[in-house]
From Swiss-Prot:
InterPro entries: Tail_fibre_p36. It holds the Pfam family Phage_T4_gp36. This is Tail fiber protein p36. GO terms for biological process: symbiont entry into host cell; virion attachment to host cell. Structural component of the distal-half tail fiber. Keywords: Host-virus interaction, Viral attachment to host cell, Viral tail fiber protein, Viral tail protein, Virion, Virus entry into host cell. The keyword Mitochondrion does not apply. The distal half-fiber contains two molecules each of Gp36 and Gp37 and one molecule of Gp35. It is found in: Virion. It comes from Enterobacteria phage T2. The keyword Transcription does not apply.
Length: 219
């Protein structure tokens, strides 16, 4: 039987033994010195390597970059999540980030169990809000005319309506009295009171028709 000593070799390589390769069992684990050896049976856990667990979750303490996007499951069909846009811009054709939903996107406060306060219908672009919408600049509408009673109205539509009202007002005579800037023509004018001032238009019973014969009776 060979006499193994410190530094014994075989084929030029040092022979491993408990002295130079200390493996110690510890329950279901095997330790090299004081370090755990991972195996197919004893796989490393997320916490052992500062990883976020797929099953148990975790917290990233610094910025995380996703080159493609983030997809989350949601009700309905189709893709839901945040994804890189086609380019640098702020138009319908070109944006930096796309937030995609099958139908709607909602916003709600984490305080209590209150309802959603803002809802985006991403199918037709409708936005619903429970509170006021305050803007430091203009709110513009592309629709030429309002449809519903509570629709916002464009300035050009209001200006056109005002001009129509003004035109109608300027072309009409007020029942309460008015002053004409031009001629007033009508088939007949009826006066309930006889003329009493030089500027009044006399009634028929106050005038003598030219070339007519008047019977003033007997005196």
């Amino acid at each position: 039987m060979a006499d193994l000593k410190v530094g014994s070799t075989t084929g030029g390589s040092v022979i491993w033994h408990q002295g130079n390769f200390p493996l110690n069992p510890a329950g279901d684990d095997v330790l090299y010195k004081s370090f755990k050896i991972y195996s197919e049976y004893n796989k490393p856990q997320a916490a052992d390597n500062d990883l976020v667990s797929k099953a148990n979750g975790g917290t990233y303490l610094n910025r995380v970059i996703f080159n493609r996007g983030i997809q989350v499951p949601g009700a309905g069909n189709g893709l839901t999540g945040m994804f890189v846009g086609p380019g640098d811009g702020a138009t319908y054709d070109n944006v930096n980030l796309d937030i995609i939903s099958w139908y709607g996107i909602g916003f709600k406060s984490s305080q209590g169990t209150g309802p959603r306060t803002i809802v985006f219908n991403v199918r037709d672009g409708e936005i619903s809000a429970r509170g006021n919408i305050n803007s430091q600049r203009q709110v513009r509408a592309e629709a030429a005319a309002p449809i519903a009673a509570n629709d916002l109205t464009r300035k050009d539509y209001v200006d056109g309506a005002i001009n129509t009202v003004t035109a109608n007002a300027n072309s009409r005579v007020l029942r309460s009295g008015d002053t004409m800037t031009g001629n007033l023509t009508a088939p007949n004018f009826f006066s309930q009171n006889p003329a009493s001032q030089p500027s009044h238009v006399p009634r028929f019973d106050q005038i003598v028709i030219k070339d007519s014969v008047q019977d003033f009776g007997y005196y």
